[in-house]
Amino acid sequence: MDNKLIYNKAASLATASDRESYKEMNFIYKFIKRVLDIVCSILGIIVLSPILVIVSILIKLESKGPIIFKQLRAGKGSKPFYIYKFRSMKIETPNIATNDFTDSHVYITRIGKIIRKTSIDEIPQLFNILKGDMSIVGPRPVILEEVDLIELRKSYNIDKILPGITGWAQINGRDNIGNEEKVKYDYEYLMNKSFTMDL
């Protein structure tokens, strides 16, 4: 028998074995990550409940409108879902991406400035995690109007994972980097996702 054929067959079997091993490891990773997301979000809600109450009262006292701001974002599979945030802007604020604002200070409330600077406005997203719409770590979900970024993420399969409260692109630049740079970091996370990287 041709040694080359034997080698190719062995290589293909090894590849199949590697794929099965990867699938198993990926399943374990996703399962444990989901459990940790649920546990951490419940603990977070309990521990941060005094802040939730105080911020809710301050928002209601300062301006008209709901305490919680709901906005459609692109989630896993690019499917839209409502993300929750403490409302930090006036109700007449245009529905555009943060980095597209030229005069955002006009729309931000006084309490809004504080909760944005400290990222307290993101706390309600713990409920998104409980619902299964988000994870603690993952690519940040973008508004549906950011079509270019959504399509770019699709082309790299980044939309196959749950969006997160924080992600690799946020740590490496947040709104100070362009779409291509964001996708580069998100893709790097996708290809190397692990508990070590999540930490």
Task: Describe these PLM feature segments.
Residues 1-19, 127-198:
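Hydrophobic structural segments characteristic of membrane proteins
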Residues 7, 69-107, 165-185:
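Short, glycine-rich, amphipathic interfacial segments at transmembrane boundaries or analogous
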Residues 8, 20-92, 128, 195:
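A hydrophobic, helix-centered structural microdomain
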Residues 25, 92-110, 114, 140-147:
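Cytosolic-biased juxtamembrane loops and peripheral soluble domains of multi-pass membrane proteins
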Residues 49, 65, 123, 138-140, ...:
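Hydrophobic alpha-helix-in-membranes signature
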Residues 106, 118-121, 194:
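Residue-level signal for the nucleotide or nucleotide-sugar donor/cofactor binding architecture
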Residues 111-118, 187-191:
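Short, well-ordered beta-strand elements within core beta-sheets of diverse protein domains
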Residues 113-135:
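Short, conserved beta-strand/loop elements in beta-sheet-dominated catalytic cores
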